[in-house]
């Protein structure tokens, strides 16, 4: 089985609902898995690296911010022959792996977002919904919206 590598870039952000979801899922995973079976990769600029009992955390890459997420992180996943687990809406363009899409408000209520923001997230979500090995989401409603706006097979989406 390929190793699972969590995208830890969310640790750079202030905690909102999306980041809290990621932290809670990871905390529960940590309790449920054998030691060393999952790794979390984080950007080098993270100062307070979380400590888990069973999840190994590793600083990797030379880039920062989005470049880390779309270059350094997927490169690390590739070198480890792993699969990425992306819990905060965004997955690397080169290899989305498993991605959690919390909502698709950019499609449902586009008037609330700038054109630039919508375009960026439409690219990210479009890539993830077409190429991800698995999509997870937070509710049946979000699942139905992903199916509606991105024409995803509902069997490829799991609600957690």
Annotate each language-model stretch with its function.
Residues 1-160:
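Carbohydrate transferase catalytic cores enriched for Leloir-type hexosyltransferases
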């Amino acid at each position: 089985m390929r190793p699972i590598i969590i995208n830890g870039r969310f640790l750079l952000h202030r905690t909102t609902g999306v980041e809290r979801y990621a932290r809670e899922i990871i905390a529960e995973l940590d309790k449920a898995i054998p030691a060393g079976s999952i790794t979390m990769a984080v950007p080098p600029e993270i100062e307070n690296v979380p400590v888990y009992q069973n999840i190994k955390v590793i600083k990797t890459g030379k880039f920062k911010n989005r470049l880390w997420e779309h270059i350094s992180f997927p490169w690390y996943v590739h070198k480890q022959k792993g699969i990425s687990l992306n819990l905060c809406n965004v997955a690397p363009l080169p290899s989305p792996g498993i991605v959690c899409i919390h909502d698709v408000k950019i499609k449902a209520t586009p008037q609330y977002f700038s054109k630039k923001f919508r375009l960026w997230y439409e690219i990210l979500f479009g890539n993830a919904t077409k190429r991800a090995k698995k999509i997870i989401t937070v509710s049946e409603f979000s699942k139905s919206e992903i199916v509606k706006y991105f024409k995803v097979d509902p069997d490829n989406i799991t609600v957690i």
